[in-house]
């Protein structure tokens, strides 16, 4: 599809992105219409998607999107969680109309519905999950583009982009690649310079994981503040000039104090014992006499 134009050939960095995101990994089941996009089958039963065919169909889909004069006439849909963020990012970059979440039946066919719209092109993430918009597109003669896995049905799909539409990284990377090629074909960005938007912004993230990361970051910040408050207090600044002493032995005079000698006693000698019985007897006699005089 890219032909002999070297500008449209797949670069090595693009191949590395596809391999890192697992875009080439299909499922264990194979639809008969997807056989043309299969490269080989692994020993565990997983089919390998030919990335060359993926790149060719990606360029064809980008050309179809660029052919629409009004970007808002392109509807991009993803009912699965893994593609909702990528759809919103793609719509913000290219100007398309996103439908993230549940698709209201009758959006393309029921004219009295509040959400009724008449797009000129439809792009879906999964033909099996987004079967309702594909069916309604067939009623109003609407061309469709779909990211198709090895087991995806190709009924009502006009341009099938073979890729892994189950993994969050693969779906986000495919929408990022499609948005980049659309902007390049429109002339918004140059092919000589890399796009400043990273594919990570198109990846789906679980809200529980985001909440856990935010809590961990908050706890880490609080712990860091407490540590700094206890151990990294600002040291007092001394601005007074300190006296300079050349020789500390000369600067301080230490007075000499004579050492007092105490006589040594022999603690082993037994102390002299006194007769305490005589004195109490004499005192008792005196008290007796005193009491006699009172009587």
From Swiss-Prot:
Pfam families in the record: 40S_SA_C, Ribosomal_S2
Residues annotated with N-acetylserine modification: 2
Repeat ([DE]-W-[ST]) residue spans along the chain: 230-232, 247-249, 266-268, 275-277, 293-295
InterPro entries: Ribosomal_uS2, Ribosomal_uS2_C, Ribosomal_uS2_CS, Ribosomal_uS2_euk, Ribosomal_uS2_euk/arc, Ribosomal_uS2_flav_dom_sf, Ribosomal_uS2_vert
Localization annotation: Cell membrane; Cytoplasm; Nucleus
Keywords attached to this entry: Acetylation, Cell membrane, Cytoplasm, Isopeptide bond, Membrane, Nucleus, Phosphoprotein, Receptor, Repeat, Ribonucleoprotein, Ribosomal protein, Ubl conjugation
SUPFAM superfamilies assigned to the protein according to its UniProt record, in alphabetical order: Ribosomal protein S2
Region spans: Laminin-binding: 161-180, 205-229, 242-295
Site label Cleavage, positions: 115-116, 133-134
Modified residues (Phosphothreonine): 97
Residues bearing PTM N6-acetyllysine: 52, 89
Chain residue numbers at which the record places covalent cross-link Glycyl lysine isopeptide (Lys-Gly) (interchain with G-Cter in SUMO2): 89
Modifications the protein undergoes after translation, according to the UniProt entry: Acylated. Acylation may be a prerequisite for conversion of the monomeric 37 kDa laminin receptor precursor (37LRP) to the mature dimeric 67 kDa laminin receptor (67LR), and may provide a mechanism for membrane association.
GO molecular function: laminin binding; laminin receptor activity; structural constituent of ribosome
GO biological process per UniProt: cytoplasmic translation; ribosomal small subunit assembly
Primary location class: membrane
Keyword NADP included in the entry's annotation: no
Positions carrying Phosphoserine: 43
Gene3D superfamilies: Glucose-6-phosphate isomerase like protein, domain 1 (3.40.50.10490)
Other remarks in the entry: This protein appears to have acquired a second function as a laminin receptor specifically in the vertebrate lineage. It is thought that in vertebrates 37/67 kDa laminin receptor acquired a dual function during evolution. It developed from the ribosomal protein SA, playing an essential role in the protein biosynthesis lacking any laminin binding activity, to a cell surface receptor with laminin binding activity.
Protein purpose: Required for the assembly and/or stability of the 40S ribosomal subunit. Required for the processing of the 20S rRNA-precursor to mature 18S rRNA in a late step of the maturation of 40S ribosomal subunits. Also functions as a cell surface receptor for laminin. Plays a role in cell adhesion to the basement membrane and in the consequent activation of signaling transduction pathways. May play a role in cell fate determination and tissue morphogenesis. Also acts as a receptor for several other ligands, including the pathogenic prion protein, viruses, and bacteria.
Assembly information from the UniProt record: Monomer (37LRP) and homodimer (67LR). Component of the small ribosomal subunit. Mature ribosomes consist of a small (40S) and a large (60S) subunit. The 40S subunit contains about 33 different proteins and 1 molecule of RNA (18S). The 60S subunit contains about 49 different proteins and 3 molecules of RNA (28S, 5.8S and 5S). Interacts with RPS21. Interacts with several laminins including at least LAMB1. Interacts with MDK. The mature dimeric form interacts with PPP1R16B (via its fourth ankyrin repeat). Interacts with PPP1CA only in the presence of PPP1R16B.
Protein name in the entry: Small ribosomal subunit protein uS2
